[in-house]
């Protein structure tokens, strides 16, 4: 988690953002000042641990009123959060990591964005989000996909409900949303040479779109590394999402 690791550039601790925030290491919900420079300055330490790949929690802009340190409520899909550094800083970190024979995994979130994303103030289309008119909370029933007895209501609530009130649920069935997200992944791979993608909240998103996303990325980069977060309570639940699984009826994600 970059914000919690090391503060290599104090000049970006308190910079102007759209929303207010504070740096307070005594508060678990505030930002603590860690950044990309701090990671770069400690690559010796990371390498000495025997690390071969670094998975960073999301580094893209998370301009939210509270709890922005974790990065899981994106407000700009093409900009590194300036409190972590710049896009160029991210590229340099990856290059420096590669020089040591290590790799970098980028954390992406396509199920939802942050409620302070400009889309929420100027929505591209009404179906850009799910349940925009009436808030629906997801039931987090991640087994709904493969439960033969699940109700349509429970399955729809799982897929289309908002993760939390500050994380609007993106409608990946909208072809423009799907294209935006797919192109965003390819852009980042091309731009910074990141070695792999960790896709957050994988079972919460539309399975057809995510399958297409995987296909498009792998068509461009056949040897690429992708892992989806499928935080299940049972082994069979995790097995459903594995590549080549016989449990998911050909929906090879």
Predicted regions and their residues:
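N-terminal structural segment of carbohydrate-active enzymes
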Residues: 1-103, 118
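A cross-domain feature marking catalytic cores of carbohydrate-active enzymes
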Residues: 2-4, 58, 106-112, 201, ...
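Aromatic- and acidic-residue-enriched segments that line the glycan-binding/catalytic groove
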Residues: 14-19, 64-80, 110-155, 240-252
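Residue-level preference for long, well-ordered alpha-helices that form the structural scaffold
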Residues: 28, 35, 82, 86, ...
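Alpha-helical packing segments of well-folded alpha/beta enzyme cores
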Residues: 35, 39-42, 89, 93, ...
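Conserved, mostly hydrophobic/aromatic
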Residues: 46, 56, 77, 97, ...
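Active-site-proximal helices and loops of the catalytic beta/alpha 8
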Residues: 94-98, 112, 117-121, 184-186, ...
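Active-site-adjacent "subsite" loops/lids of carbohydrate-active enzymes
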Residues: 120-192, 202
């Amino acid at each position: 988690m970059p914000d919690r690791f090391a503060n290599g550039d104090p000049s970006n601790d308190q910079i102007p953002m759209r929303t207010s925030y504070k740096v307070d290491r005594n508060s678990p919900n505030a930002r603590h000042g860690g950044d990309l420079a701090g990671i770069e300055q400690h690559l010796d330490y990371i390498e000495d641990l025997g690390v071969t790949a670094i998975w960073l929690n999301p580094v893209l802009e998370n301009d939210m009123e509270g709890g922005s340190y974790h990065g899981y409520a994106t407000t700009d899909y093409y900009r590194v959060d300036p409190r972590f550094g710049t896009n160029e800083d991210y590229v340099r970190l990856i290059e420096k990591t590669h020089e040591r024979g290590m790799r970098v995994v980028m954390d992406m979130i396509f199920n939802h964005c942050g409620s302070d994303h400009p889309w929420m103030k100027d929505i591209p289309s009404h179906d850009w989000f799910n349940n925009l008119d009436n808030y629906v909370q997801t039931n987090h029933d991640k087994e709904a996909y493969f439960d033969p007895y699940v109700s349509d209501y429970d399955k729809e609530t799982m897929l289309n409900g908002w993760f939390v009130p500050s994380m609007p649920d993106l409608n990946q069935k909208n072809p423009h949303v799907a294209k935006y997200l797919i192109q965003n992944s390819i852009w980042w791979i091309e731009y910074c040479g990141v070695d792999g993608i960790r896709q957050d909240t994988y079972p919460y998103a539309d399975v057809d779109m995510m399958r297409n996303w995987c296909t498009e990325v792998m068509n461009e980069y056949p040897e690429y590394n992708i892992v989806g977060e499928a935080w299940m309570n049972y082994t069979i639940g995790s097995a459903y999402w594995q590549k080549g699984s016989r449990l998911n009826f050909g929906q090879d994600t």
